[in-house]
Design a protein with these regions (language model features):
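A glycine-/small-polar-enriched, mobile loop at the entrance of the PLP active site in fold-type I
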Residues: 1-19
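Conserved PLP-enzyme active-site core in the AAT-like
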Residues: 10-14, 27-201
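Generic structural marker for isolated residues within well-ordered, non-membrane alpha-helices
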Residues: 22
């Protein structure tokens, strides 16, 4: 029995138990890689946006109210918002062609009662245009057959609390290159999810 390791394992730059749990998550969601981060679902979205975008770049979102904590991240990063109606794929394609967003954030669950878009179709439209996409799967993970990264998103983000795991731990799951950029920012022991926290996931 173990309560997990702490600090930075030489050669890994993270706790070994944390690395193992991340691999389990990646395997569970048929993804290349996963990273556990501080800050629950909001922290996961922040980490993913920072890996995909630089300050001042353009983020495409659905033409609907943006989740309040996500809006704070957008404002902190100084991102320019571009909106499109994800319910209308032709309108979405037109906005992408005209506005050339640098990345897109797609909420898996409905943002408003009238939303009817099919996540995989929206992601296919974005991928065809070469727009990197991350999905907010906070209210969908473990309640749907496939999360965003299994439907074509570059990465999915969610709180591990939604997996009945610990409060305050988030997960980013998806493309290895995006996860690698996130890991590059977690260079200190204090920024890591420690082994004991990872075991609770």
């Amino acid at each position: 029995l173990t309560c997990g390791d702490l600090g930075l394992t030489p050669g890994l730059n993270q706790p070994r138990i944390t690395q193992r749990v991340e691999q389990v998550l990646a395997d569970a969601f048929h993804a290349q890689a996963a990273a556990l981060v501080q800050g629950a679902g909001t922290g996961a979205i922040r980490a993913a946006l920072a890996a995909l975008l630089k300050s001042g770049q353009r983020l495409l979102v659905h033409d609907a109210p943006v989740y309040p904590t996500t809006r704070v991240i957008i404002e902190q990063m100084g991102l320019t918002l571009i909106t499109a109606d994800f319910n209308d794929l032709s309108a979405l394609k037109q906005v992408v062609d005209e506005q050339q967003p640098d990345a897109a954030l797609v909420q898996h669950t409905r943002q408003q009662p009238q939303d009817r878009y099919v996540l995989a179709d929206v992601l296919a439209t974005l991928r065809a245009a070469g727009v990197p996409a991350l999905t907010d799967d906070n209210y969908a993970v473990m309640k749907v057959a496939r999360i965003g990264c299994e439907c074509g998103a570059n990465v999915s983000t969610f709180s591990c609390f939604k997996l009945f795991g610990p409060e305050g731990v988030g997960a980013v799951v998806g493309d290895a290159d995006v996860i690698s950029r996130i890991r590059a920012t977690l260079y200190s022991g204090g920024s890591q999810i420690q082994g004991a926290q990872a075991l609770e996931v």
